[in-house]
Amino acid sequence: MIEQTYKIVAFGSDAREKISKGVQQLTDAVKVTMGPSGHNVLIEQPNSPPILTKDGVTVARAIHLRDKFANLGVQLVREAAQRTAEEAGDGTTTATVLANALYQEGLMALSAGHGLREVRQGMMAASRSLCLEVQGAAVPVKTDEDLLRVANISVNHEKDLASLIVDAIKAVGEHGTVTVDEAKGFESSLEVVDGCELDRGYTSPYFVNKPSRMACELTNPAILVTDQKISSVSHIMHFMEESAREDRPFVIVGPETTGDALQALIMNTTKNNMKSCVLAAPEFGGARLEALRDMCILLGTELLTGDPTQWRDYKLKDLGKCKKMSSFRFRTIFVGAKGSKESCETRSQEISEAMKEADDDLAQVLARRRRRLNSGIGILRVGGSTEIEIGERKDRVEDALYATKAAMQEGVVSGGGSLLASLAKKKLNSDTNMPIGEAIVYRAACEPLRQIAQNCGSVPDVILEKISEKPEGYGYNGIDGNICNLLEAGIIDPVRVTRLALQNATSVSVNLLSVGCSMVEDDLVDEQFKD
């Protein structure tokens, strides 16, 4: 029996208008959270309590529209927003608002008869120019007070959480790792334990068991570290059987796990027969083998080499161990690694000696390896009075951690969307005959500030006009409604967040404007019988 599916097809402006409805609905849901007076969003969850959140990522992930054409727009803009959050830790809402403004302005330009090529080129050029201006306005983050300001804004002005974030970053260092967990009571706390972060994530989204965070979280996993490719389920069947029997998660870290081995792990995981995850091996080329040996020392195991059919004598107890593993799309965190401290220190010293004679490229690889061995893991436990409150605070703390680290690396600028709006408004006032594509970007760049002002009860056009008359660094303070020097007031945004939000929003909006045809599945299915 064959099931024949059908497509519904839309063309040209009709396709773009349908996509536009989805982008607008996503933006309308997300933008209410912007600024110090932003509102919470209440989200129903099947078989779980509802979520109350001010986190743009969580809101965006929850939106799935019945209109399939509109949902295409939701998916693409959500991807751009999530990419911003993954790379900078914040800026999801800003990226969404910018993408919608750019797309709607672009649609109007196309409807007015402007050519797609003209619009695209102008938008890309203006976006690059504006990003360079943002980078040029960067102010370095030098003191703990500067860090505290960034964290305080990102965590929505909860000073106790902001202080814990700064303490956590200081405890593990700029390149160290901090994870966020739930506290058992109302109080939040910080603990530093042995562990490491791997710049590789899960190889398949089917291993995700925390959809709200797109994460695979496993407690007390048995971790197989190998330099061999695993393609047959027979290579790991005894591990899988023991994992299911003991209800202990099974993890593979290696160069490649494919074929029926990967299929068996995915099938048994999705059917809840066992918990598992497959991670890509760190580094490339000759550095990969040594990096895998580092992992073995950290996790207290040995590297499995040679023919995988000869691994039958190994049990889960012989594999690597840690208290908790959290794997995301591009990174994995091992908390409470069970390796010997003395072995880690010895290995670290060997790497330090090798760095003395290494060229620049090799030295960077060695430095990464040494950092994995030396850096502890900070566990920031977030408390609250209810499960909903704890979940909402956790989301904000995770965003704030990334944003604070981003500020340390690229500096900060005046926040609340004020810098983008100020630069854009001055450009629009000074050049009234700029190409249409450039004008689209500069008009859209004012939209985040407009929304923040609106959420705070101010008149957006009045605020924009006032800012355009002030020198750089001045902007709108949504807390008291005044125009002031935002850098002095501590209202700041990391450069990376602002830059990536604009870059990713421009990229997705330009691609959406280029759509000439869109297709979605028709719900009608034909069933035909073969001879």
Region annotations inferred by a language model:
Residues M1-N47:
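N-terminal, positively charged regions that mediate nucleic acid binding
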Residues A10, T84-T94, V412-S414:
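Glycine/serine-rich anion-binding loops at beta->alpha junctions
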Residues F11, E17-I19, H64, F69-N71, ...:
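Extended, low-charge hydrophobic alpha-helical regions
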Residues I19, G35, G89, G113, ...:
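Residue-level signature of catalytic and energy-coupling elements of molecular machines
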Residues P46, V97-Q104, R128-C131, Q135, ...:
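Core structural elements
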Residues P49-A85, T203-A215, N220-P221, V225-H238:
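Glycine-rich oxoanion-binding loops at beta->alpha junctions
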Residues A109-A151, E217-N220, T226, W311-K338, ...:
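A structural-propensity feature for long, helix-poor, extended segments
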Residues R128-S414, S518-D531:
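Long, structured protein-protein interaction/assembly regions in large complexes
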